[in-house]
Amino acid sequence: MKLEQSKIIGLQKWVFIVSVLLLLFKLTAWVYTGSVAILTDALESIVNVVAGIMGLYSLNLSNKPKDTEHPYGHGKVEFITSAIEGVLIMVAALFIVFEATQHLLHPQAIRSIDFGIVVLLLTSAVNYALGWYCSKVGKQSQSVVLMGSGAHLKSDTYSTLGIVIGVVLVKLTNALWLDASVAILFSLIILRTGYKIIRQSVSGIMDETDMLVVDQIVNVLNEHRSKQWIDVHNVRVINYAGFYHIDCHLTVPYYINVNEAHQQMDAFTALLHNHFNGQVEFFVHIDGCVPQQCKLCQIQACSHRQTDFNALQDWTRQNLLDNAKHGLQ
């Protein structure tokens, strides 16, 4: 197992452990205060615990090596568990709306408000610190699970702070309706967080092109392009939880032999392999150039040239994604 993957799994274990502890603290605060706003926070923490378990499962499964039944590995499971986490978040938010509505219709006095405020402030500080670190490591490793955990924990922090403000206002004004109103407000924020996690997960499941990754490929190839690479087109990028599969067509001079073409392909893939720190595999189709592309070709000493070199064409996101050789329009 790679050190990086061990770090990711170890961090997810801490997410689970901390989520359980924070849940116990918040449930205690709810029992002591009877605040539906604090119940809102506790319910979201239950989702954190369930998400932590699923995250650990998916990380361990996604780390399994490829096999004949899963030739691209098991990384897609991270998208599935993240989608389930998003659904759970939205269900919790809807339950909060229901409970808060009941409290609006039948207000109840809040007890031990100071105790509840202190507990929420402490848990929010722990949540934000852990969420920030999860987001940082998740972005570095392209782990969907960690990025989802980080986003969830940080949003939990913001909602907790908002709930603290609401509880403080209840204490100052004795307006019990504020407790339920704050709960409803932050349940809507939680709903939005759940939707964003589901949206990101569905993008991964449906192999939606990550344009930021495509832009990285464009920049690297433009900076290090070889004269032998006439063009690159029909680029397809699939993200398997931080491990990329790249399909593309590489156009080379039509007259070079198979061994020479293979050498160009090796140089091409090595360039991207280094950029993605080895977390990538390729399927490269070799095309031969056509006479219309002579105007783009930098190989001046070419006995097969039919048209003078005109100008070097920049490789862009659009012409790399298009399934067409460059210069034929």
What are these regions (language model features)?
Residues M1-Q12, I197-Q329:
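Peripheral (non-transmembrane) domains and long loops of multi-pass membrane proteins
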Residues M1-Q216, L320-H326:
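Alpha-helical transmembrane cores and adjacent cytosolic helix/loop segments
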